[in-house]
A protein has these predicted regions:
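Surface-exposed patches in mature extracellular/periplasmic domains of secreted proteins
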Residues: 158-178, 182-185
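Active-site-adjacent loop/helix surface patches within enzyme catalytic domains
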Residues: 2-162
């Protein structure tokens, strides 16, 4: 939903906040009546066992998100994307659409996913961040990655957010949005 209008998402499992099983934020966001023009899509790794547990954590902290993607690939919309969710810092929130993708990250939770019928998550090994090699961690299910692609395409089509990866000054993929970049968008 964008400015109270439905937009299609080419995906079999979408739950809107007012549907059965939907979760809606009642605080922690800014309601916008005039149609806003978001310019970026911000994805977060929720480090929770499920979208529902992520939603509860955000709510307790007074934060909000537009979408979550659950373990089975279900896309849940929690806020009209016209509203400003509190998910990425004040300079970025007003210009962005936020999504949390569910994965507990730590390998000690692998058994929970198997026991609850989701199957084993991919284990990522050898990943580097800022020159340091991370310990093995749980990745996303392929169905979650496909759901994210479908969501990004749908949001792009209704908001015209470019489908481009942000680059830093050297032309490398940027995983953070700098203050300068946020101000320019």
């Amino acid at each position: 939903i964008y400015n109270n209008d439905f937009f299609p998402i080419d995906w079999p499992r979408v739950v809107l906040h007012f549907n059965h099983g939907g979760l809606v934020h009642t605080k922690g966001f800014k309601k916008v009546m005039k149609k806003r023009k978001p310019t970026m899509f911000v994805t977060h790794w929720d480090v929770c066992l499920s979208s529902e547990s992520c939603f509860k954590v955000l709510t307790r902290r007074g934060l909000s998100i537009h979408f979550t993607i659950d373990n089975d690939g279900t896309i849940r919309q929690h806020l009209d994307i016209n509203h400003i969710a509190s998910h990425a810092g004040s300079k970025v929130n007003a210009k962005s659409i936020g999504v949390e993708v569910s994965s507990a990250y730590y390998t000690r939770y692998q058994n929970w996913y198997v026991k609850n019928g989701f199957g084993e998550r991919p284990v990522i090994e050898g990943a580097k961040v800022h020159g340091s090699t991370l310990k093995p961690f749980l990745g996303f299910y392929p169905v979650q990655e496909e759901a994210l692609k479908a969501l990004m395409k749908a949001v792009h089509e209704c908001t015209e957010i470019p489908l481009k990866t942000p680059l830093d000054k050297s032309g490398e993929t940027s995983y953070n949005v700098s203050r300068t970049a946020a101000a320019a968008r």
